[in-house]
């Protein structure tokens, strides 16, 4: 995962080291990670390989990560429904948090825990976003599960300004840090998959409380 994090306020110039991708590490360790287009992707390991998920978290901590991200990406209602796991939203989300918390405790280090408000539908597909009210309601359900459980909530891999607004709006009163992460499109510099310029997208969310902005899940050449 490629992250450029822009923190606001007093922390603005402080380097924060995060973890890396979960899916690629699971594959490297022999775990089946199906295509993100047709499945729950790396979240499948929550049903089959929880110990390896914890090992990935521990390895990132050992490598110097100051925060780790729970493996709840793709744990959304639309994606779970496609995998016949529609009634597992809360259970799988809480399981991902429990695994990460166990890793932090086992490490004995002061590590922050993050979790995702990911795209509700297939990642990078701005054309698949739901209407705003449905997005808001589904993000609110996820936000309610995460509230009080994590240090950071990341609105992650946002491909459309309204998707980002819906996700970020549901955590305005959260006690967790609020991060907003955009993804960029192919070789189109500064452009979201929706076709919006990132500055235009920022205008839609600029009045919402946000502790950090970031660019993720795109080539390093797009953000440097």
Residue ranges and their predicted role:
Residues 4-224:
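Domain-level signal for soluble alpha/beta catalytic cores
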């Amino acid at each position: 995962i490629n992250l450029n994090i822009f923190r606001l306020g007093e922390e603005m110039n402080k380097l924060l080291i995060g973890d890396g991708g979960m899916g690629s590490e699971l594959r490297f360790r022999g775990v089946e990670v199906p295509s993100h287009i047709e499945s729950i992707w790396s979240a499948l390991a929550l049903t089959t390989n929880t110990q390896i998920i914890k090992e990935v978290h521990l390895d990132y901590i050992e490598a110097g990560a100051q925060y780790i991200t729970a493996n709840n990406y793709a744990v959304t209602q639309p994606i779970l429904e496609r995998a016949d796991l529609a009634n597992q939203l809360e259970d799988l989300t809480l399981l991902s948090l429990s695994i990460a918390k166990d890793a932090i405790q086992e490490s004995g280090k002061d590590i922050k825990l993050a979790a995702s408000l990911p795209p509700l539908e297939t990642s990078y597909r701005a054309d698949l976003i739901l209407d705003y009210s449905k997005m808001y309601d589904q993000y609110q359900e996820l936000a309610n599960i995460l509230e009080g459980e994590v240090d950071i909530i990341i609105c992650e891999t946002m491909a459309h300004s309204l998707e980002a607004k819906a996700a970020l709006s549901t955590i305005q009163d959260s006690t967790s840090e609020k991060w907003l992460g955009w993804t960029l499109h192919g070789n189109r510099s500064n452009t979201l998959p929706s076709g919006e310029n990132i500055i235009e997208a920022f205008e839609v969310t600029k009045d919402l409380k946000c502790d950090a902005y970031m660019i993720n899940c795109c080539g390093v050449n797009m953000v440097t």
